[in-house]
Amino acid sequence: MEDLIEASHLPGVVLIELDGILTTQMSDVNDVHGIPMIWEDTGYTGEGSVVSIIDTGIDSNHVGLDDMDDDNSTNDSKVIAFYDAVNNPDKTNGTEIKAYDDQGHGTHCAGITAGTGAPDFVNIGVAPQAQLVGVKVLDEGGSGSFATVMAGMEWTVDKRHDFNIRAASMSLGGFGLIEWTSSEEESVNRMANEMVRSGVALFIAAGNSAISAQIGTPGSAEDVITVGALDKDTSIAVYSSQGPTEEGRVKPNIAFVGSSVMAPEANSGDGYVAYSGTSMATPGAAGLAALMYQANPDLSPFDIRNIMQETSTYRQCHYLLANEPCPEDLIPKNRQNNVYGHGHVEGLPALLEAANYVYGLNTDINLSVDSDLSEENRINLHPGESFAVSVQGSPMEVQWRTWDMRDNWMSHPNFLEGETNFEISHTMLVDRLQYLPGNQIEGNQTVIR
């Protein structure tokens, strides 16, 4: 009260009044990204998909997260497994502990991904018929050690087949927000990439440091889908962290509504609360992945990311709220920028593109690297060098791409049908990488098998 009286005496102050709080219902979030059109036009609601929420836990007693059909007489749990890396790290089978949340952040995220919206069905999650796996890596204060975060990520990879985990949401980390050593940060990023390569589409929050900080661990990991936050009008939220990463990598990948989002309030029974942050944007994007996996279970995590990126609506970045566009905006084929990534996510186009992905796999075709590999399965190419690959099975063509996930698959220029070998040269790698904006390539190149 004393502060208000003091403020009232400041020069120029005529009136002081309460500032009302505006909230965004989940129905509004879903509308922005076209989610209801998916439900209505295709019937996909996430059934059969499982998303891991790696966070503070999940309150599985909340009416929006306790079961699939909001009928207490049926035995159809929404949360099918739970691992507590903080307080019960030795209980690893996933069914020994009932899911809980002593902080609330994870429950909120879980509801955005797959909440049923009970009891009033206003704040329905993006994939309301998807199921969840809770992985508690943050304590009651919302903090997480290197050991617990790594344990939760490793557990998710180990149990991905047991519980059919296809996607994961991690709303944690950020530049300078978790006190890890550089070695620990590298390990977490490496584990994040390993999760993706093992078959889990991993969505990570960009962070809430706005324009003042880079995107840090684990959102800086190369293979993950880093998510920035939008306001309801699809403009970038003022708090949403912007790239590049410390390594110079362009991030985020995509942007999703994250401001003042209503979702389940932990330990309230049936209450809902509004939070803001890239933490709220990330589980929304993970929910869309659950819908896409229902439409096409054969998708890889890289397919999920590429489809979301390619179908997003590009937004000019306008660094520092300047009136002129930033360099990426001037490229004829708009590319990822450090504010919006590839743009704001468009749900229905992404879903339809996912449903149309068709795979024809011939297991008789094999590729093998003939050049010598290091102990880490790497080849270090110097300028002028190449590495050789043998082909078995008579493919019609060979396609390749660089390690940069913004790159596109392309046919090998010198491979003809019926040939049994081909080479990838240092020049080919450098030419492709330099084509992508933001890359400065020189010297040797390393190829990971």
Enumerate the language-model features and the residues they cover:
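Autoinhibitory propeptides
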Residues: 1-50, 66-69
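Short proline/glycine-enriched turn/loop motifs at strand-loop junctions of beta-rich domains
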Residues: 258, 392-398
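Surface-exposed, flexible coil segments in extracellular/virion-facing regions
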Residues: 406-431
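Subtilisin-like serine protease catalytic core
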Residues: 39-81, 89-147, 161-167, 197, ...
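Substrate-binding/access-modulating region of protease and related hydrolase catalytic domains
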Residues: 45-47, 60, 116-120, 134-223, ...
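Extracellular S/T/G-rich loop segment that most often corresponds to the catalytic His/Ser-adjacent loop
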Residues: 76-88, 216-294, 298, 302, ...
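Hydrolase catalytic cores
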Residues: 110-113, 133-139, 168, 214, ...
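Secreted peptidase-domain scaffold signal
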Residues: 182, 207, 336-338, 344-371, ...
